[in-house]
Amino acid sequence: MRFWFVLLALLGKEIYAYENERNALNATAANKVCGLSTYLKGIAHRVNSESAVVTEKLSDLKMRSIQLQLSVMRNRVPSGEQDCKDIRTLLKTVLRNEFTFQQELEEMRNASALAAAAAGLAAGRLEEWIFVFAQAAGRSSQFCISVGKTGPAEYNNLQECFDGTIGPETLYKIEDSRVKESAKTSLQLHEVLSSISFGSLGVKNIRGGNGKDGCNLVRTDTDGVLEGGSPTRHNLTWGGGVMNFGSYQNGSMYVEGGEYGDATEYGAVRWTEDPSKVSIFKDVIRLFARFQEAKNAVVKKIKTTVDELTKCIGQKEAELTNDQLYEEFIWETINRLELSKRVSEQSAFGEEEETIVKFNYTAEPVRGPFTVAGANAAAIHLSVSTAALCRSALLLGVL
């Protein structure tokens, strides 16, 4: 942003043209560009929201795993399911998968951070462009964004760009409701990008003004922003490659569709035909696709594992709330561990008959005064940790 303020300062007294045939950017195109900028900022909210859904699915998997273990301890695994015959192997696989899924979840979060960062950078480039053009306005014949009249566009003509009087403080921020709402739209990235293409906008919505608008920011001739223009060095681009100018463009802005590399002729003006080829959008497309791929992969794996678990869970265990499940599981585990200890001690004295009886125990355990509903946050956290430790112990030989 500092660069553009310096540019404006340097061009301040000569930023407007002194000859005719100087057109401005149409406010319609400016608003479309700002709409894209808002959508790109919203990608941060979008990836955070989608990541939270995956985290919730992983938590659900852990609960299904506990339900299954409780069903096993109470001999309530559906006997008719062929896939439930080798429960021990299934549980080990689930625990191993949980660890793998947690790693994949972290990789997905890293991908989401990169996608959000790339989108934020692209959004910044776009809004800096429109901000500079909106600020470059003086008398009725000197402005760089036009609304089809003899005067510059005001903030009410650029409501997709500014939330009030034109200025850096009124650009939409990432925490604004407008940006958050954009994250909820069903529009996909490629659809929003295509909305600013030359084919979507057309010349009439890009080239504004009446030919006497005096905008020097669309000139690359010797009197424009690139003084002493050279046909090999002094091409100009705005928006990171959205609007491109060849050397010696006098401001007439006879725009055609094309990319930065196509603006090679004298006086050429090319507005992107394919935004996916614009450099600032390439990283957004690539990194957002990587995030989506990582998200979809881990969601699919979690769903497959949950489906395998669900068909082996007893009906009563499936009906428990999460709080009830933790309480039941903890007390059942404590009871089983105590029982295993007693059996081990008795076995040392040859009490084989009692050992058999104990190992076939299926009664509900006697519970103490503990209830999750009445516990404080620290106790709940401790119970979750205890449950995780007990699950490992069960798989090591208690079951």
UniProtKB/Swiss-Prot annotation:
The keyword rRNA processing does not apply. N-glycosylated. Glycosylation is dispensable for heterodimer formation and host transferrin binding. GO terms for biological process: symbiont-mediated evasion of host immune response. It is a lipid-anchor; GPI-anchor. Disulfide bonds join 34-161, 84-312, 144-215. Its main location: membrane. Keywords: Cell membrane, Disulfide bond, Glycoprotein, GPI-anchor, Lipoprotein, Membrane, Receptor, Signal. Induction: Up-regulated by low iron levels. It holds the Pfam family Trypan_glycop. InterPro entries: Trypano_VSG_A_N_dom. The keyword Repeat does not apply. Residues 1-17 form the signal peptide. This is Transferrin receptor subunit ESAG6. It comes from Trypanosoma brucei brucei.
